[in-house]
């Protein structure tokens, strides 16, 4: 699967269809959910779900709910990350952050609602009918593990606790693995699970996801010091302002670029665990490593 306009349109339509009706008393909440969920972005995680599903012989129909669920989790995390009690960022994807439009109270609840909607989407009658009970249950287990206290949320806690501490590289590695790589890793595994893949394929996809996930975060650190707010669609330089350690502050830009290249090659090598054509995923990994926004 390539990141074509048709693919992007299918993802956007699927996400919209998952949202509750806006004809209700809690319309402001639904508006806030839609505001962030439909704000665009790279859609890396659903793309990986669809790509690994296809690689394992699945169908777009079987991948849709899994792709939507992981993007809902990602979107809720961004809403919460931007709150004043967290990163206190006013800009996301080139638009005012959710709490700047709807208020902190509704933004908090919109994030909570997207979190719960993700698991409803994975386990509703339609998804179970398409993918089977076993795949849906395993999907819930994988997504909750990688998004929870020992995954994405745990990474955010380490991030908060690392402010003004000059955290060493070991802490940074753990934080970035949990905060960023875990959900990308989950997306790769979910794509395989939705297609009924075997454990060997899931393990290979997991390794690919972990490598590009960490590379993705290192590239983010590079862009945070080499790009502008307008180019990235979000504030840059906030890590330095909050005295947070980053790969760039600890290792320098050139070493970071070397690490991104090494991790990307390792990710591509992990794809050798599949019998199908992995060319598009390989190209995607290289493109992600060279992104400028």
Q: What do the PLM-derived regions correspond to, one by one?
A:
Residues 6, 10, 19, 23-271, ...:
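Mg2+-dependent prenyl diphosphate-binding active-site environment of isoprenoid biosynthetic enzymes
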């Amino acid at each position: 699967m390539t990141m074509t306009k048709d693919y992007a349109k299918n993802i956007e339509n699927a996400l919209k269809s998952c949202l509750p009706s806006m004809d209700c008393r809690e319309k402001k909440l639904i508006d806030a959910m839609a505001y962030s969920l439909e704000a665009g972005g790279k859609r890396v995680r659903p793309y990986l779900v669809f790509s690994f599903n296809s690689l394992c012989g699945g169908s777009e129909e079987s991948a849709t709910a899994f792709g939507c669920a992981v993007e809902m989790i990602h979107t809720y995390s961004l809403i919460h990350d931007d709150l004043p009690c967290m990163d206190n960022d006013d800009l996301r994807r080139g638009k005012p952050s959710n709490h700047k439009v709807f208020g902190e109270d509704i933004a908090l609840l919109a994030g909570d609602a997207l979190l719960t909607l993700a698991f409803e989407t994975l386990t509703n009658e339609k998804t179970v009918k398409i993918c089977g009970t076993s795949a849906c249950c395993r999907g819930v287990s994988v997504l909750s593990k990688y998004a929870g206290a020992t995954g994405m949320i745990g990474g955010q806690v380490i991030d908060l606790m690392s402010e003004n501490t000059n955290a060493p590289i070991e802490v940074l590695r753990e934080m970035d693995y949990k905060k960023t790589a875990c959900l990308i890793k989950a997306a790769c595994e979910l794509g395989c699970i939705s297609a009924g893949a075997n454990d060997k394929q899931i393990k290979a996809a997991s390794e690919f996801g972990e490598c590009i996930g960490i590379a993705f975060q290192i590239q983010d650190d590079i862009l945070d010091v080499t790009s502008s707010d307008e180019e990235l669609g979000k504030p840059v330089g906030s890590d330095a302002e909050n005295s947070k350690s980053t790969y760039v502050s600890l290792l320098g830009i050139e070493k970071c670029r070397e690490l991104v290249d090494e991790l990307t090659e390792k990710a591509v090598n992990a794809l050798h665990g599949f019998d199908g054509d992995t060319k598009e995923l390989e190209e995607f990994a290289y493109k992600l490593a060279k992104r400028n926004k």
